[in-house]
Curated annotation (Swiss-Prot):
Disulfide-bond pairs as recorded: none
UniProt-listed Enzyme Commission number(s): 3.5.4.33
Protein's UniProt name: tRNA-specific adenosine deaminase
Encoding gene (name): tadA
Organism name: Rickettsia felis (strain ATCC VR-1525 / URRWXCal2)
PANTHER family the UniProt entry points to: CYTOSINE DEAMINASE FAMILY MEMBER, TRNA(ADENINE(34)) DEAMINASE, CHLOROPLASTIC
């Protein structure tokens, strides 16, 4: 999660919403990809940290199935990212801060508990949550 927080810091410095993600090989615990939100620079609403990381990981291993990998993300995934996590079959999801506005894992939609979700990763929340929360708070304080 510390590496995901570093990625969130990079996003913060680029005036992107500070969310970072890393995907880790479960067998050797090595990070295979890391990413951060990039919606402003790319002018594309789809460039969330999770989507970028999943795309890069699939390209790296030449597979759409990431069942031997875990994702660490600093903020509770939105509906789009939760669906991408399910579709790519990541084994475990670790996230930091909850997102009361857009979170779709445990805060609002609860995507993985819905009837439309066909795959549910193991979910672990609250990891370094305060660090993530503070970074988000600073970011939105700065832009308002």
């Amino acid at each position: 999660m510390e590496q995901a927080l570093k990625q969130a810091g990079i996003a913060f410095d680029k005036n992107e919403v500070p969310v970072g993600a890393v995907i880790v090989d479960r067998l050797n615990q090595k990070i295979i990809v890391s990413s951060h939100n990039n919606t402003e620079e790319k002018n594309n609403a789809l460039y969330h940290a999770e989507i970028i990381a999943i795309n890069e990981a699939c390209n790296l291993i030449s597979s759409k199935n990431l069942n031997d990998y875990d994702i660490y993300v600093t903020l509770e995934p939105c509906a789009m990212c939760a669906a991408a996590i399910a579709h790519s079959r990541l084994k475990r999801l670790f996230y930091g801060a909850s997102d009361s506005k857009h979170g779709a894992v445990e805060s609002n939609l609860r995507y993985f508990n819905s009837s439309v979700c066909f795959y549910r990763p193991e979910i672990y929340s609250g990891i370094l949550a305060e660090d993530s929360r503070l970074l988000m708070k600073e970011f939105f304080k700065r832009i308002r």
